[in-house]
Each structure stands twice: as structure tokens, then as C-alpha cells.
Amino acid sequence: MPRRSPADPAAALAPRRTTLPGGLRVVTEFLPAVHSASVGVWVGVGSRDEGATVAGAAHFLEHLLFKSTPTRSAVDIAQAMDAVGGELNAFTAKEHTCYYAHVLGSDLPLAVDLVADVVLNGRCAADDVEVERDVVLEEIAMRDDDPEDALADMFLAALFGDHPVGRPVIGSAQSVSVMTRAQLQSFHLRRYTPERMVVAAAGNVDHDGLVALVREHFGSRLVRGRRPVAPRKGTGRVNGSPRLTLVSRDAEQTHVSLGIRTPGRGWEHRWALSVLHTALGGGLSSRLFQEVRETRGLAYSVYSALDLFADSGALSVYAACLPERFADVMRVTADVLESVARDGITEAECGIAKGSLRGGLVLGLEDSSSRMSRLGRSELNYGKHRSIEHTLRQIEQVTVEEVNAVARHLLSRRYGAAVLGPHGSKRSLPQQLRAMVG
């Protein structure tokens, strides 16, 4: 798709947005220095939109749609992308699903054709359902065998309980084993509606040309479906208290995740929370990394994580250590968390954390794929584009006083925790951990 020479070069570099009939949005960002183009169809539906009886449906469907369409087999789809040296893939998260392609700019029409065909026309054929069911069950088994992956799911379940955010994106072996073709087809029909979809592209792309391609390949699907958009599952307050979960497993290491519930991504102190997370365990100079690993050598892997959803979130700490060092790791971790809750972080720590966030943000947007992802996520989450400059200003405006107020507010909350390792009972776990969970 050749680009027209713009009268205003600065305007040509600004992201553009078009809303088509039915609510489907097209957002693009032209990057003059690249030859590639990345395009993704972002659907505002994820694992939290599933009922308990179809847990894992969003992820199962994502797999299934690639198996065949009325005009292409799975091999046809793969060969078409391989023939141009591109990448075609998808992923499912708690609140969205994305189908994307990365190609040369000249091959963008093919990429849009393939992605649209998969998203709109995937057949969910009976034979395909059974084959892909086995693939997903293997993926679940592989995830269960990875302590870090398994623990991540265990932790969110311990923190959020029966709330949909607490369920694994991938579902369970039990739910996937009994899921029917009819349930998957219904999920596709009711959830993959144009008002939930964003087509995002970045790189060597022309906005008007992409809009024309979307009109061509989405066609009649651009109008609203006959059924109303199903409401999001699990919005609002999380019921129940965080808890402690233990999976006893014969392993060389003990793996632990513990953390607290936080407000969602729309919280006014969202960036102060990110600074707090970074100062706690987001880098090599963070409190936890320095105290647990560098000073005492108690663990190789120790870090914090921050997961933010529409209406809730989780700030967590992960560590893996020899079982005989578990009590010491928990003692030091508890001391760090209590110290930060009581005394806060220093001005210097705040400055380092802000610099880390700024640098990570900019360095993470050096290619068309990451730019496309930012466009799609921003449109789904906020209904508009949030520029990098806007985010950098938000980070810069964070003060150490705001961070420490957030720490006092959140770190005194009741913790949820998950432990995986060679421990026979919860009573055998370190007292510091049991005290934090309450």
C-alpha cells in the first residue's frame, strides 16, 4: 500500500483512528524508518468473560479458529504466511484476545486477509475441536509442569478466589475436556462483535489503505449482530478474603508468590503504584533483589510483578529457593515489605524507579509489533490513543510522597499467597508467611 506524501510531515506520524459502522475501530501509526508492518485484530474478550462452566473457552477458541476456514485449511494458512517470511499468531489474556501478523509492508494486504479470515470465518469443525482439545490439554499439562507458570495461576486464585480474574486463562483439564463445539461456537458468535474489535497496525502502513482493506475483508460483519453484546463477567467487587494455597510437590526448590489486591488500571495513583513495584522488585537495584539475592544469597530468582485489570489488580512478589532457605527468604521479604509500608522508599529509589519505567517504556517501543500492541491495548482499555509522551509525563509527575502514601495504603492489606514445593502441610510453612496471610 503506497503512502501519499503528506502536506504536514508531523501530522503524518501521528496515530490515526477511524470508527466503521457497527463500532469496529481502525487505528494506525506510520513509522517511516521501518520496512515491516504489524497488524492485529484485538477483541475485547478474555478469560474473565467466561462462565465457570466454560473456563478456558476464549483460549480454546483462539487455537481453534486457526484450524480451518471455508476457503483455507490450517496448512493453507501456514503456507501463505511462510511464503512471505512473516509471522502469524495469537494470544489470549484475562481481558482481551489478539490475532496478529508481522510482515513486510508490501504484504500487508495478505496479512489483513489471513487475520480477518481466521477471526471471522474459523469454522469450529467437529474434527478440529477434538484435535485441538488434545493440543490444549497438552499445553495445560506443560504449564502445570512449570513451577513458575503453575504458581502464577495458583497465586491469582488464592488472591481473587472464585472471581473470574482468579481463574487461569488456559482453563483447567476438567473444563476443557467437557467443552462442546456448540459452546465454543456460541462464544464466538456472541463475543466477537464489531463493537468489541479493534484493528491496529503500525509500521510501513497507510491508514486509508488499511481502512479500505478492513472494509473489504470484514464486509457485512461490520454491522451489529442480532444479539446484544453480552456483558463482561465478574465486574465489581471481589468477594472473600485472600488465602494461602499450598501444592505439595517433590521438587528441588520451593516456589512462593505472595501479594495484595490493588485498584485497577484507571486508578489515579496507577503510576505511583508502578514506581512502588519497580522499587520493590522490578530491577537489579530493587530492595528485594538486593536484600534477598545480592546481600544474603538466599535465592537466584526474586522479583515483583504488577498485573492491572479494568477494575482490580495484583501486586506480587515471587521467589524460588532451596526449601531449607525458605524461612529466611520469607523473613527478609516480610522485613522489606514492612519497612516500605512503614517508612516508604527514598527519593533516590523513587528517581531510579521512574527512570527505569521511562527507559523500559521507550526501549520497548522500538519496532512495529510493540507499537501495534500499544495502539490496540490503548484503544481497548481507554477508548483512545494514549501517546508515549503522555505516559512519560505521568511517570515524571510521580513524587516520592505519593509513592509512600500508596505503600502505606496498600502494603498493610491482607496478603494472598501460593506455595509450591516439598512441604507437607500449611502448618509447616514459615511463620512470617502465615502471619501475612492471616
Swiss-Prot record:
Q: Name one Pfam family in it.
A: Peptidase_M16_C
| Protein name according to UniProt | Uncharacterized zinc protease Rv2782c
Name any GO cellular component annotation: plasma membrane
Cofactor binding remark: Binds 1 zinc ion per subunit.
Q: Where does Zn(2+) bind?
A: H59, H63, E139
Name the family the entry cites: Belongs to the peptidase M16 family.
Source organism of the structure:
Mycobacterium tuberculosis (strain ATCC 25618 / H37Rv)
Q: Can you tell me which residues form the catalytic site?
A: E62 (proton acceptor)
